[in-house]
Amino acid sequence: MKIAELNLPQALKDFYTGSGIPELYPPQAEAIRQGLLDGKNLLAAIPTASGKTLLAEMAMLKSIAEGGKAIYIVPLKALASEKYDRFLEFSKLPIKPDGVKVGIATGDFDSRDEYLGEKDIIVATSEKTDSLLRNGASWLSGLSVVVADEVHLIDSPNRGPTLEVTLAKLRKINVNLQILALSATIGNAKALAKWMDAALVQSEWRPTTLKEGVFYGRAITFKKEKRTVNNAGPDEVNSLVADTLEEGGQCLVFANTRKSSESIAQKVARSLSKKLQPAEKEQLAKLKQDVLRHAETDTCEKLAECVGNGVAFHHAGLKGEHRRIVEDGFRQNILKVIACTPTLAAGLNLPARRVIIRDYKRFDVNYGSVPIPVLEYKQMAGRAGRPRLDPYGEAVLIAKNYDEFGELMENYINADPEHITSKLGTEPAMRAHALSAVATDFCRSRQDLKAFMDTTFFAYQRGDLSHVIDNVLNFLLEENMIIESKGGSLKATDLGSLVSKLYIDPLSAALIAEGLEKAKKRPDVAEFGLLHLICSTPDVKSLYLRRGDYSWIIRYADEHASDFLSDVPDSYGDDVEFEQFLAGVKTAALAEMWINEKSEEAITTFFNIGPGDIRNLMETCTWLMHGTAEISALLGAPATRTARELAIRIENGASRELLDLITLKGVGRVRARKLYDAGYTSRDKLKAAEIPAIAAIPGIGDKLAVSIMSQLGRKVDHTPPETEEQPQVSGQSTLFSFDG
């Protein structure tokens, strides 16, 4: 089916044909026949790289040309940025007089973001979309198309319930809405399509042939052929990587832990470094410098060394800047190999000639080492083969013995993906969504709420949710977040409305409110008490306790005994409860290190985590501390000012004395400290300074000095020279002392 034949605006057809896409892939053509361009709901359950995004673009842009508006829902912020960048390419498309306006929404969860109403395409995470619904964003009722990318993640215990409820709500508020769901190949696609009232396009077709096999005995056994790996040595991964690179391909290597991915990258880098050409070394040296420009920890320096040899590792413990450098370097074929954890398979567009799945088992805290689902394997395998660049793609598992070889062939290569199931039917999943439905007047009684929940995928699969709903509503009543009249109508209290808008778990809010009531009886509220309070909530993923942690954490808890705003369990009582308490103390200790300006290196070393983990954890803590300040203000507790200051300090990793400087754009924790130590302890002192004096401070430079003065409202005549801005450098490097 030719692009030129489609019922699309001519400008869009010209755009695609001019981009080298003259005709559709078979699954895309089937989607057209099923009514994609006629406003019909559609579920496309097709492999990676078979053109799902193009389906979304055509549906959205045709609707926009007719006066509509679209939202593109993704599971990850990184994927949102990738799609946003792609859709910006349509901004000058003359299908509307003023072009196509694109927006992105991944930030604060307590805003309506009404400015997005001016956009034609909005890219958002499912959590952000849910929060926009809770905060009453008026433009949502004007949507004509909703695209749900990676919709099979309804199966995820963490993200699934939010995506499921969000889709159900959007369908209810706009009956003419077209829903386009994009999914990996799943076992029960028909059931998911039926729930959505959608036509189903299901296919195994790929533009690049995918060969799936198992490496054992110096050969890869595929379904229909066997291939010997030349010069295979004792290290299977190195052998498979070398074999791919000799043919001009790139490799992704999936490992089950961050440490394993780093170890693999280092081994492959040592091997590859001897084979690099001078021109390649020059490109890689530049990329290495890009990594070092943002380096503050051993992990970053380790990454830089690997990158200098054409290899990288990629996991959630890396800083966002480093992940982007790695991804871009791989897309540009400067980096040849990435060793990564399975998070890379969750949507990011980074295909490679060969995908090596080194580990097919992962550790589960309840069951030990367990095999990964077939669906997860298929997601990783689907990254093999770059369309129009590779003649084929290969996904290779590694067997350690003959029995394992047979198991891998049967359980993965020749297996079908599992059915996905809704995870909405638990009280933790239901709490926030029930409160949201009541707080937004979406549901005004128990009957309303049950009727709405009957429209979810959970109800479609498993039936009645009444018992769970009743338990959750009773909890919300007990915690004074909703009230129920004698006539049965439900209404949110001021606390309930606030909690819903803040987008935090009602149980977290209940624990925070309880702690703040205790604060009313204290002469003052300790910072550590507030840090521990938020780190003890279900919204914060507490740090794991290691064997060597117990003595210092118990000692530290004793030193802060008078600070705690939550009950301190008896160490001789419930072991689980006491361990949870200690985990909260450990996590709060990390937050305290962060706001006391300890270096990332000190924190990552002491707590054995990655720099990306610090950022992710502090982002959550910032939001919860902001929520704590809002709840404190509502309850009239004495913690409001302290909590507001702490939220700013956690966000920036700064001491209290830097509050006046830290909120200046471009001034991070390290630069603020340098300014303060140079005598510029306030904005007034900074404003009175001479620009050259500010620029001379290490890490500032002319460009930032001019920017700072402009932000302070000072007239600037100084023109900075055209020099590269100095990178931020690491500050303190001493390990955290628990002696006060």
Curated annotation (Swiss-Prot):
Catalytic activity: Couples ATP hydrolysis with the unwinding of duplex DNA by translocating in the 3'-5' direction; ATP + H2O = ADP + phosphate + H(+)
Record domain Helicase C-terminal: where: 236-436
DEAH box, short sequence motif: residues: 149-152
InterPro entries per record: DEAD/DEAH_box_helicase_dom (IPR011545), Hel308-like_dom4 (IPR048772), Hel308_SKI2-like (IPR050474), Helicase_ATP-bd (IPR014001), Helicase_C-like (IPR001650), Helicase_Hel308 (IPR022965), HTH_61 (IPR046931), P-loop_NTPase (IPR027417)
Keywords: ATP-binding, DNA damage, DNA repair, DNA-binding, Helicase, Hydrolase, Isomerase, Nucleotide-binding
An example Gene Ontology molecular-function term: DNA binding
GO annotation terms (biological process): DNA repair
Disordered: annotated span: 716-740
Binding site for ATP: Q28, I46, P47, T48, A49, S50, G51, K52, T53
Matches recorded under Pfam families: DEAD (PF00270), Helicase_C (PF00271), Helicase_dom4_arc (PF21280), HHH_5 (PF14520), HTH_61 (PF20470)
Sequence ranges assigned to domain Helicase ATP-binding in this UniProt record: 33-204
SUPFAM superfamilies for the chain: P-loop containing nucleoside triphosphate hydrolases (SSF52540), Sec63 N-terminal domain-like (SSF158702), Winged helix' DNA-binding domain (SSF46785)
SMART domains (UniProt xref): DEXDc, HELICc
The protein's enzyme class: isomerase
Polar residues: compositionally biased ranges: 726-740
CDD domains: DEXHc_archSki2, SF2_C_Ski2
EC code: 5.6.2.4
Transmembrane portions of the chain: none
Subunit structure: Monomer.
Record function comment: DNA-dependent ATPase and 3'-5' DNA helicase that may be involved in repair of stalled replication forks.
Protein family per UniProt: Belongs to the helicase family. Hel308 subfamily.
Name of the protein in question: ATP-dependent DNA helicase Hel308
Organism: Methanocella arvoryzae (strain DSM 22066 / NBRC 105507 / MRE50)
